[in-house]
Amino acid sequence: MKKKILFWILGIIGILIIGGGAYAYSIYSSVSKTLDEVHKPLKRDKDSKGTEEVKISKSEPVSILLLGVDERGNEKGRSDSLILITLNPKNNSMKTVSIPRDTYTEIVGKGKSDKINHAYAFGGVDMSVATVEKFLNVPINYYIEVNMAGFKDIVDAVGGVDVNNDLEFKQDKHHFAKGNIHLTGDEALSFTRMRYEDPRGDFGRQMRQRQVMQAVIKKGATFSSLTSYGDVLTAIQKNVKTNLTQDQMFDMQKNYKNCLENSEDIQIPGDGHKAADGIWYYYVPEAAKQDLTNKLRAHLEVTK
């Protein structure tokens, strides 16, 4: 679920709104209702780094945390994927940081250290944002949360997706052959969940998430796949939450999309091993974390 999830959501919205003439006008109210439903403000401490308002309408640098949440049944779940995106429209650039889910760090508000993805189980998106913000020492202005269990509805809404699979494997009840394959929503969910059979581990899983997301963007970019736009909007409404307002989404789609032209993917260096309690953690050296902090703060033009 790499960088383009943000512009996939905004892109579909943009296609629906500015796609053309009476068709776009006729569905405006449906899109507007969907955006109202997915809006969920953050609860922040007053001293949070991300509380200072970023003026998206004036194209100021901005940061967004993307959370892929694995919720099954009545379980609250954990953040299956954590990706921080920084956008600087002044030089049309974007940086995306994939944060390993097993990263050992302080869980803000819990009074202890644990795997970073546990923050969501302890305190939802509010605690997740606060924890990542402290871990990287950068302000997080906005978030987009996607329920990965319901992600299959989004894939099915665009008619399934095609991907090129570089590793044959089985996951759940599905077999995934090597090469070009078509995925239904249920298959896409299993495809993006597998990591234990992949020698690349969590990084391989993140790559598959990116493949599926890019394929969804490709399908969503054509009107032929959006004739059932109601299904797309329903899937988004049920499975996406964000503190971006409707106006901010439209401004971002308009003012920030060129940032894709100059994109840098960043993997956090570290070492994974079992701790004394027998639990596997991913440890990030302080020097490596500080280098990353400096790079992100410079990209966001943060000086204090």
Curated annotation (Swiss-Prot):
Supply the enzyme class, top level.
transferase
User: Could you tell me which residue ranges are on the Cytoplasmic side of the membrane?
Assistant: 1-4
- E.C. number, please? 2.7.8.-
Extracellular side stretches: 26-304
User: Which InterPro entries does UniProt cross-reference here?
Assistant: LytR/CpsA/Psr_CW_biosynth (IPR050922), LytR_CpsA_psr (IPR004474), TagU (IPR023734)
Question: Which UniProt key words apply to this protein?
Answer: Cell membrane, Cell wall biogenesis/degradation, Membrane, Signal-anchor, Transferase, Transmembrane, Transmembrane helix
Instruction: Quote the protein name from its UniProt record.
Output: Polyisoprenyl-teichoic acid--peptidoglycan teichoic acid transferase TagU
Per the UniProt entry, what species is this protein from, by scientific name?
Bacillus cereus (strain ATCC 14579 / DSM 31 / CCUG 7414 / JCM 2152 / NBRC 15305 / NCIMB 9373 / NCTC 2599 / NRRL B-3711)
* Location in the cell: Cell membrane
Q: Which residues cross the membrane?
A: 5-25
NCBIfam families in the record: lytR_cpsA_psr (TIGR00350), PRK09379.1 (NF006897)
Q: Name one GO biological process term.
A: cell wall assembly
What membrane topology is annotated for this entry?
Answer: Single-pass type II membrane protein
Gene Ontology terms: cellular component = plasma membrane
Q: Which Pfam families match?
A: LytR_cpsA_psr (PF03816)
* Alphabetized Gene3D superfamilies for the sequence: LCP protein
Query: What is the purpose of this protein?
Result: May catalyze the final step in cell wall teichoic acid biosynthesis, the transfer of the anionic cell wall polymers (APs) from their lipid-linked precursor to the cell wall peptidoglycan (PG).
A molecular function annotated in GO for this UniProt entry is: phosphotransferase activity, for other substituted phosphate groups
Its UniProt pathway annotation is: Cell wall biogenesis
The entry's family comment says:
Belongs to the LytR/CpsA/Psr (LCP) family.
Q: Per its UniProt entry, which superkingdom is the organism in?
A: Bacteria
